[in-house]
């Protein structure tokens, strides 16, 4: 039986928190198991002076971790589900989806309570095209500026006056014990989250049955059902993690209620739709919702985004 588990992780405080959380859970579940972290930098961590959407490509934050597993330098990788591409390299798979933290976006400001309170010309920071398109659609009088860096860097930029407000994933702030910085949670009706937002996923080698057995107790079936529906929608749209796509699934009894959107980054056009159906068919529902959005014109919006990405890269 495996006595040692090596976790590949990014070096940011949030990534390390996530890896340490899984380390702690594994050690609690399997006394005597040695779990160590293997921190490394990814392309998305290194290129900090360019908007994420312009770096382009899928898996900006995961490729180096996957190479480490394939080369045998690490056994598993812990990811934010929203950063994880929908396809995996041969030999690797997403095995475990852990219990979800709050999936909503957080509004953070030192002077205003929520988006509705921001005056004309107020500057809002976000690196997400998904957040940008929803804010610009509903609040065209606001100025959206790109915001990169880790959570602490983003908060510092707000505190130094570069922005009137910033929008971050609530889950990251809560996990870093910075929940007191959340001025308000943005309702999903106002800012539909990214697929998988707030959930952690564990990737491992496809043929590593011992590792899968160790990870099995960390699986959260409810979160898995919801996130698989969201990811299936993203896959149907051929979306990466840096695209203006929102997907949010809720479980209502044994039914899934899935909402999705695709929008132009400037908020000029935002497509929305929703589906309901049995939880046992979560992924089919996600694919169905993608089809409905494509019929509304999602492909044209996304190809324009990809074209502008490639012209900047």
From Swiss-Prot:
Q: Which GO terms describe its biological process?
A: protoporphyrinogen IX biosynthetic process
Tell me the keywords, alphabetical order.
Answer: Porphyrin biosynthesis, Transferase
**Group of enzyme by EC:** transferase
Q: Which GO MF term does the entry hold, naming one?
A: hydroxymethylbilane synthase activity
| Superkingdom, natural source | Bacteria
- Report the co-factor binding details: Binds 1 dipyrromethane group covalently.
Question: Which cofactors is this protein said to need?
Answer: dipyrromethane
Q: Which residues carry this modification: S-(dipyrrolylmethanemethyl)cysteine?
A: 241
Please give the catalytic activity noted in the UniProt record.
4 porphobilinogen + H2O = hydroxymethylbilane + 4 NH4(+)
Q: Does the keyword Transferase apply?
A: yes
Provide the assembly information: Monomer.
Q: Which family does it belong to?
A: Belongs to the HMBS family.
Q: What else is known?
A: The porphobilinogen subunits are added to the dipyrromethane group.
Protein name as annotated: Porphobilinogen deaminase
Give the species this sequence originates from. Idiomarina loihiensis (strain ATCC BAA-735 / DSM 15497 / L2-TR)
- Which lineage ranks, top first, belong to the organism behind this chain? Bacteria, Pseudomonadati, Pseudomonadota, Gammaproteobacteria, Alteromonadales
Q: Which gene encodes it?
A: hemC
């Amino acid at each position: 039986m495996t006595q040692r588990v090596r976790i590949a992780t990014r070096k940011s405080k949030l990534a390390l928190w996530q890896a340490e959380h899984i380390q702690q859970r594994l050690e609690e579940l399997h006394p005597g198991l040695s779990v160590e972290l293997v921190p490394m930098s990814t392309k998305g961590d290194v290129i900090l002076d360019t908007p994420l959407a312009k770096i382009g490509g899928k898996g900006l934050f995961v490729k180096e971790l996957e190479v480490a597993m394939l080369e045998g330098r690490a056994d598993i990788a812990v990811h934010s589900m929203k950063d994880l591409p929908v396809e995996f390299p041969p030999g690797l798979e997403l095995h475990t989806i852990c219990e979800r933290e709050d999936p909503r976006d957080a509004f953070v400001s030192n002077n205003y309570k929520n988006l509705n309170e921001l005056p004309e010309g107020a500057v809002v920071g976000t690196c997400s095209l998904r957040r940008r398109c929803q804010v610009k659609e509903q609040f065209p009088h606001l100025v959206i500026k790109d915001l990169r860096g880790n959570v602490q860097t983003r908060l510092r930029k707000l505190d130094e006056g570069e922005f009137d407000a910033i929008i971050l994933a609530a889950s990251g702030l809560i996990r870093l014990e910075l929940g007191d910085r959340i001025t308000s949670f943005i309702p999903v009706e106002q800012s539909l989250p990214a697929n998988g937002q707030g959930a952690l996923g564990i990737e491992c080698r496809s043929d590593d049955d011992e590792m899968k057995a160790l990870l099995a107790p960390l699986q959260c079936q409810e979160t898995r059902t919801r996130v698989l529906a969201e990811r299936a929608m993203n896959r149907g749209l051929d979306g990466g993690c840096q695209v203006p796509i929102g997907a949010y699934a809720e479980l209502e009894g044994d039914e899934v209620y899935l909402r999705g959107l695709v929008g132009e980054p400037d908020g000029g056009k935002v497509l929305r739709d929703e589906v309901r159906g049995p939880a046992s068919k979560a992924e089919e529902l996600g694919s169905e919702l993608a089809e409905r959005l494509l019929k509304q014109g999602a492909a044209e919006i996304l190809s324009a985004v990809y074209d502008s990405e490639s012209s900047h890269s």
